[in-house]
From Swiss-Prot:
GO molecular function: ATP binding; ATP hydrolysis activity
Binding sites annotated in the UniProt record for ATP: G209, P210, P211, G212, T213, G214, K215, T216
Phenotype reported upon loss of the gene: Reduced fertility. Reduced number of seeds.
UniProt name for this protein: Pachytene checkpoint protein 2 homolog
Keywords linked to the UniProt accession: ATP-binding, Chromosome, Meiosis, Nucleotide-binding
Gene designation: PCH2
UniProt-listed InterPro entries: AAA+_ATPase, ATPase_AAA_core, ATPase_AAA_CS, ClpA/B, P-loop_NTPase, Pch2-like
Keyword Nucleotide-binding listed: yes
Family under the similarity heading: Belongs to the AAA ATPase family. PCH2 subfamily.
A biological process term (GO) from this entry: homologous chromosome pairing at meiosis
């Protein structure tokens, strides 16, 4: 969020475009735009506006009611004339209620409405404020007897463990927004009582693609995001991560009991009023492989009964209005047809493109700069490195050869991103660490030396990838 040229009292605001977890303590001053003549007045309040999400995270020590904080933030936004862009809003020092209770205020997902790095003006926007408080408890593991692995892990959402996960995942083609809109529509259709015999939807999402592309993380981040966006309707949210491999027991007929126990637990959660339940089944192709093996005679018939029981239990959950099933698969060709037919969305999550690779490395380097591991560079505005979409404005031939300048830095970062073609997002996140470990002087803060080393590290990592 940045200032609007219209001068109003207390209209100044600071914003940082860093990871929301860290950026709350590192505000960056944004320059004020020059006044522009506006022959036409802003649109009236009754005209259509863009809905922009404003997420407000309460401090762990806060005992304030979420509704009170929501109203306080809405009043703060109404009293300010600003432009809207993704980033953190500095909490006004004179608002003691917000200072005492709010950890951060974040503007989210404005890129869905704007193009070419534009911003939304205050009269174009209707802020939708979501208040939440993170749960600091870790996952609760289901303990099984006889040395069996746990059949599921349970999180209460929104969990501190998943804080910032949504923002750290970068994809092309609006995948994250597509999933958000799907989930919102699925819950709305259920809430409005749409007849499922006339309009069918199963509330099942299938993400498939090669390993390391963030499918499981995206499912967890989606559950976290929806627990924040839907907390006025569902004040209690839980994530159940099913361990598909644990559903197969070495004892005959025991596997069916494990499935029954698992879904009995899920059914109890679903029946609670005001509860929203997310069921995550990771590596769902393992179930498909077991069923095929059982049909061919190489596995006991108990395996196929487990898979069929699981599918039957999933069908039973269809009648529950407050459950969403998230599934992932690493092997697209091995996905069971029964699962494919049930999924409303079947999204392929492939290796990162050049644009995505650059943005991932950019976020990593900004984090290292903010922690003082490497130094900033000449012409850098605080910790912000230009995004991939704005590079054409930054890369001029006259400056690109001057080291430690923004154009040179971006050019080197692009070279590193090009050298990472074929690497997964998981490998890309490790690259800055491996590059720093390869430095002759690990205490050197020279950004040019670090980037050159990262380019070499990227080439080495790519050459060591299996064919």
């Amino acid at each position: 969020m940045v200032e609007d040229p219209i001068p109003l009292p207390n209209a100044s605001m600071e914003v940082s475009y860093q990871n929301p977890i860290e950026a709350a303590t590192i505000p960056v001053q944004i320059a004020v735009a020059e006044p522009v003549a506006t022959p036409n007045p802003p649109p009236c309040l009754h005209e259509n506006k863009f809905l922009v999400s404003v997420e407000v995270c309460l401090k762990p020590s806060s005992t304030a009611r979420l509704e009170d904080v929501q109203r306080a933030v809405e009043r703060m936004l109404e009293n300010r004339s600003m432009s809207y862009a993704d980033g953190l809003v500095l909490i006004p020092a004179d608002d003691l209620f917000l200072v005492d209770n709010v950890q951060r205020i974040c503007i989210c997902d404005t890129e869905e409405w704007v193009k070419n790095n534009d911003v939304l003006l205050f009269w174009q926007v209707k802020p939708v404020v979501h208040t939440f408080q993170l749960i600091e408890e870790g996952p609760c593991e289901d303990l099984c007897a006889d040395g069996q692995p746990a059949s599921f892990n349970e999180w209460i959402l929104p969990a501190k463990e998943f804080d910032g996960l949504w923002e750290s995942l970068i994809y092309e083609s609006g995948l994250k927004q597509r999933l958000l809109r799907y989930a919102a529509s699925a819950l709305l259709f259920t809430q409005k009582g749409v007849n499922p015999n006339l309009v069918s939807w199963n509330r099942i999402i299938l993400l498939h693609g090669p390993p390391g592309t963030g499918k499981t993380s995206l499912c967890k981040a989606l559950a976290q995001k929806l627990s924040i966006r839907c907390n006025s309707r569902y004040p209690h949210c839980q994530l159940i991560e099913v361990n598909a491999h644990s559903l197969f027991s070495k004892w005959f007929s025991e596997s069916g009991k494990l499935v029954a126990k698992l879904f009995q637990k899920i059914q109890e959660m679903v029946e609670e009023d005001g509860n929203l339940v997310f069921v995550l089944i990771d590596e769902v192709e393992s179930l498909a492989a077991a069923r095929k093996a059982a049909l061919s005679g190489s596995e006991p018939s108990d395996s196929i009964r487990v898979v069929n029981a699981l599918l039957t239990q999933m069908d039973k959950l269809k009648s529950a209005p407050n459950v969403i099933i998230l599934t992932t698969s690493n092997i697209t060709t091995a996905i069971d047809v029964a699962f494919v037919d049930r999924a409303d969305i079947k999204a392929y999550v492939g290796p990162p493109t050049l644009h995505v690779r650059y943005e991932i490395l950019r976020s990593c380097v900004e984090e290292l700069i903010s922690k003082g591991i490497i130094s900033s560079f000449q012409g850098c505005d605080g910790l912000s490195i230009p995004s991939f979409s704005s590079l054409k404005e930054k890369l001029s031939e006259s400056e690109v050869h001057d080291t430690n300048t923004v154009p040179w830095f971006c050019k080197q970062l692009i070279e590193a991103a090009k050298g990472c073609e074929g690497l997964s997002g998981r490998s890309l996140r490790k690259l800055p660490f491996l590059a720093h470990a390869a430095l002759a002087d690990p205490y050197s803060h020279d950004p040019s030396n670090f980037l050159c080393t990262m380019i070499e590290t990227a080439k080495r990592e790519k050459s060591e990838q299996p064919e």
